[in-house]
């Protein structure tokens, strides 16, 4: 859907599942189950389609601005049938923040569409683009209920080559369940470093381990 906030989908909190190292929600009215997990440098997404569709689209939006953050330049391109490479430079939360990425797809898209919105630095440079906001649309045809597509996106603050190295080191496959289990195991190990006595009230245990979890992700 198109709205003032940009491309979006409705959801209900009733469909959410949130655990250490895992998040899931159903996008309505598309009936798409979204699941997220991660390694240290790789974000892993799985989209499961809950009904048949002639065509579905996964959108990589590098042109998106939210609150005080804005794109000042970006790029994204298919470096292979199952790999997307690019970068996003932004301003706002951090000045001239540079993030490079490589995304591995569990299956190639039938078609990829790329749009680039030019950015103009000032009124004195009308017509001179100093950067672009890029959006990639990945189209998949004849998707059946229960089918999934997994994306593994590695990040680097140094270069696209660095992002590729991180992907190769931490995401050699596209098995979402294996990444989720690994994340759960790591969180269990970290959170178990401090054990409360068995007579600690459940409410205090919840408060303590929630605070410990938040401290670990900072």
Positions of PLM-derived features:
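Beta-sandwich/jelly-roll carbohydrate-recognition scaffolds of carbohydrate-active enzymes
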Residues: 1-218
């Amino acid at each position: 859907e198109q709205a003032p906030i940009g491309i979006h989908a409705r959801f209900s909190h009733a469909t959410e599942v949130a655990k250490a190292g895992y998040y899931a929600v159903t996008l309505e009215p598309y009936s798409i189950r979204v699941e997220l997990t991660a390694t240290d440098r790789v974000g892993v997404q799985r989209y499961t389609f809950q009904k048949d569709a002639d065509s579905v689209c996964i959108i990589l939006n590098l042109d998106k601005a939210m609150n005080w953050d804005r794109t000042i330049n970006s790029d994204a391109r298919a470096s292979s049938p199952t790999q997307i490479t690019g970068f996003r430079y932004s301003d706002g939360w951090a000045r001239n923040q540079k993030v490079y990425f490589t995304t591995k797809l569990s299956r190639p898209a039938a078609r990829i569409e790329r749009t680039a919105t030019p950015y103009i630095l000032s009124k004195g440079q009308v017509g001179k683009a100093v950067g672009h906001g890029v959006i990639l649309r990945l189209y998949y045809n004849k998707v059946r209920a229960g089918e999934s597509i997994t994306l593994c996106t590695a990040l680097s603050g140094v270069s696209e080559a660095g992002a590729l190295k991180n992907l190769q080191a931490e995401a050699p496959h596209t098995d979402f369940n294996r990444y989720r289990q690994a994340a759960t195991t790591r969180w269990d190990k970290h959170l178990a470093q401090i054990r409360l006595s068995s007579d600690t009230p459940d409410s205090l245990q919840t408060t303590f381990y929630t605070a410990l979890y938040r401290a670990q992700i900072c």
